[in-house]
Amino acid sequence: MALGSNTKFYETPNHPFQGERIADEANLIGRYGLKNKEELWRAQSELRGYRREARKLLGSAGEHETESEEFLARLKRYGILNEQDQLDDVLSLDVTDVLERRLQTVVYRKGYANTPEQARQFIVHGHIVLDDARVTRPGMTVETAVESSVGFDEHSSLSDELHPERAEAQE
């Protein structure tokens, strides 16, 4: 018997066709190199969960002080919030804040790839390591503490500075 969850990790939009929403989604997919809209909807659902949790904690005022601190610490650890941000700042987050913390985006922003799509390819093909461990999930959320350890695998052909794909970026 197969094990696993039959629930989706995202929620689809309520209305199937809204031109403005579709244009916004296409823009985000292109900017962050996402494979399909499901990845975008998953990030939106993750953000929706953060905001729901923040509203719950704000509504209960001082009752759940430790939960509030743990929640804020988690978001700060992932780099979604800055160190000085408070609980009500979670409500003003945007989906781009979540998408910026994906491994694919971090690899692209650090200059290891020329495009977000190329960053995705490098990750999926096993050329990228995180804390000396090969990671093949482009949608993985990168913590700020390990962000500096992102790099090419030493056994990868891309670790050579003169590799054609890396030489393109230097020109």
From Swiss-Prot:
Superkingdom of source: Archaea
GO MF terms, alphabetically ordered: rRNA binding; structural constituent of ribosome
Region (Disordered): 148-171
GO biological process: ribosomal small subunit biogenesis; translation
Pfam family, one: S4
SUPFAM superfamilies associated with the record: Alpha-L RNA-binding motif (SSF55174)
Keyword list, A-Z: Ribonucleoprotein, Ribosomal protein, RNA-binding, rRNA-binding
One GO CC annotation: small ribosomal subunit
Bilayer-crossing regions: none
Protein's UniProt keywords contain rRNA-binding: yes
Domain named S4 RNA-binding: residues: 101-165
SMART domains per the UniProt record, alphabetical: Ribosomal_S4, S4
Biased segments, Basic and acidic residues type: 152-171
PANTHER family assigned: 30S 40S RIBOSOMAL PROTEIN (PTHR11831), 40S RIBOSOMAL PROTEIN S9 (PTHR11831:SF5)
Family designation: Belongs to the universal ribosomal protein uS4 family.
Subunit organization: Part of the 30S ribosomal subunit. Contacts protein S5. The interaction surface between S4 and S5 is involved in control of translational fidelity.
Role, per record: One of the primary rRNA binding proteins, it binds directly to 16S rRNA where it nucleates assembly of the body of the 30S subunit.
Protein name per the record: Small ribosomal subunit protein uS4
